[in-house]
From Swiss-Prot:
Feature: compositional bias, Basic residues: 36-47
Source species of the chain: Human immunodeficiency virus type 1 group M subtype B (isolate ARV2/SF2)
Motif segment (Nuclear export signal and binding to XPO1): 73-84
Protein name in the entry: Protein Rev
Span list, region Disordered: 23-48, 90-116
Length: 116
């Protein structure tokens, strides 16, 4: 399977190029025309996008043996997350600028999805 450790990435790159070509073959609709014409073009475009999405999923699962959907990430409970704004907050004069740190109580939170 391409993309796995020890395997060639050629098949993965070829598959990505094919999926990219599919999406490029369906550009967004033009904003010209009457409201009804624009609505119809958007509706047809969305339907083609849905078809491309399903074809892309089929290509990924058939040629690469993997799911089109990402593996869900197990996140810790929100009650255990805190924002630490002790660094770089208010120093620059612009509110909301900077990257607040997210502190997690303990790394053991990410180990299992069961509650204690």
């Amino acid at each position: 399977m391409a993309g796995r450790s020890g395997d060639s990435d050629e098949e993965l790159l070829r598959t990505v190029r094919l999926i990219k070509l599919l999406y490029q073959s369906n550009p967004p609709p033009s904003p010209e025309g009457t409201r009804q014409a624009r609505r119809n073009r958007r509706r047809r475009w969305r339907e083609r996008q849905r078809q491309i999405r399903s074809i892309s999923g089929w290509i990924l699962s058939t040629y690469l043996g993997r799911s089109a959907e990402p593996v869900p990430l197990q996140l810790p409970p929100l009650e255990r997350l805190t924002l630490d704004c002790s660094e770089d907050c208010g120093n620059s004069g612009a509110q909301g600028v900077g990257s607040p740190q997210i502190l997690v109580e303990s790394p053991a939170v990410l180990d299992s999805g069961t509650k204690e």
